[in-house]
Amino acid sequence: MPTIHWLGTGLSAIPGLKKLIENGHSVIVYNRTVDKAIEALSGVDGDYQVVPFSIEAVKKYASAGDLVVSMLPGNFHVPVAELCISLDAHFVSSSYISDEMRDLNSAAIKKGLCLVNEVGLDPGIDHSMSHALVQEYRNSSVFSKENSHSFLSYCGGLSDIPNDFCYKFSWSPLGVLKIGRASCRERV
């Protein structure tokens, strides 16, 4: 089974990462601060290891057919995707497709590789967990087609400290400003 290489353990990364590990996937977790990644995964049982993040570390551990998931700031995505292409590994991120990322598409296609971006809402991969919650409800003993529910996601945090954006900056402020110009609707 291919290894999943998970880059970054920020606030939006942990639920999806835990789900992969708990479902039996082999994962190498890369983080700038190893102790923070270990703390974030405390109590999680499964096949994973934590190593310091660097492009060189990903190059050392990733192999052909592996999957690299980048939850890093957007400026890392293109260099990581380029590395993935050179290693014959697949790449996934939650970020919007930049022109530089779009330019990598033909090289990936020629090698039969997937470069998957814009997974779900930005910050993306974490929000796929909402689909898992809906599915758990549908499979539960309390599910009924007659029930009516709503689900609202703000894709971030409401700030305890008032600011002009009414937003808690827990990820890239530039990313927050860019996402503010886009709209998204999801029907679950």
Give residue spans per PLM region.
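Hydrophobic/small residue at the entry helix of a nucleotide-binding pocket
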Residues: 11-13
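NAD(P)-binding Rossmann-fold cofactor-contacting core
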Residues: 27-41
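Rossmann-like dinucleotide-binding core of oxidoreductases
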Residues: 113-187
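Conserved N-terminal Rossmann-fold NAD(P)-binding element of oxidoreductases
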Residues: 4-9
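Rossmann-fold cofactor-recognition segment
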Residues: 44-55
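N-terminal Rossmann-like NAD(P) cofactor-binding module of classical short-chain dehydrogenase/reductase
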Residues: 66-71, 91-93
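ADP-ribose/adenylate-binding Rossmann-like module
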Residues: 83-101
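Rossmann-fold NAD(P)-binding glycine/threonine-rich loop
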Residues: 95-117
